Amino acid sequence: MAASVSLNKDFALELIETNLAVVRKDIRRILSRWQVKSSQEMIEMTEKGELREAEVDALALTNLIDKEKELEGLHAFVDEA
């Protein structure tokens, strides 16, 4: 049985934007820790073994990127509603 919830559009957008800000801050923190400029660069360097012991952060980064894309899609959906 599915439940539905009514939510103010502006409030929903604010929640999504706040979550996006947290995700992006976490992405920047990981990139800064490894002194790389982009997520793609870090993932590639980790796969090549150029960043030793970065596997856990690279996996977290991949998950954060997925979450960022999901939130961006949700933001666009809610914004267009």
Regions found by a protein language model. Give the residues of each.
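Short, charge-rich amphipathic alpha-helices with coiled-coil/heptad character
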Residues: 1-11, 46
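Short E/K-rich amphipathic alpha-helical oligomerization segments
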Residues: 29-51
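Amphipathic alpha-helical coiled-coil segments
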Residues: 9, 13-23, 27-30, 61-64, ...
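Short, charge-rich amphipathic interface segments used for partner binding and complex assembly
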Residues: 44-67
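Residue-level signal for short amphipathic helical patches enriched in basic/charged
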Residues: 18, 37, 78
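Long amphipathic alpha-helical coiled-coil segments
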Residues: 70-81
